[in-house]
């Protein structure tokens, strides 16, 4: 069977929008900054904020505070840099909270991925080969697009045994909104395509879809898609 599958760009819609509080202390060479971040990566936040301010990393502390979910949407920097720079220059605590509209516009979305898939099985319904070419729209900036497409490539074989695999996934930059981390991290889009062709093959082979999957599912000791042993 041969088919093209396409997924859409999706918004995380986490409960609370991005919010940051930055509090400066001291003066001159002793000046430091404590940032309360609702993000997902305190070390990356610290490093990026220090670079924005042009100071040593040791002068910036980032503390993660509880938030109403993120699902990958707060993995990239959002308003941490804005709050930090304003607090540093003004010498006063600064809090920056995005509106829902600002949040929608600013943070990365789930990657739309187009997957051209060719797959086959023998007359008994045993999977033979899988050929996939996937392109992910990462938008104008890279974010973690390369890793998302790497994960998509690793998961597109699904939990099945294939006699032959030929898989290539590419993250491309476009003039569309930026895409990055989203729960599943590329595996969701890949599995949508995989399970689609499994259904098509089962129908052509005249085998119940559940039985077809049971016949081909990996078991302990099998080597599957990414080369890992189950």
Regions found by a protein language model. Give the residues of each.
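Structural alpha/beta core scaffold segments of enzyme domains
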Residues: 1-230
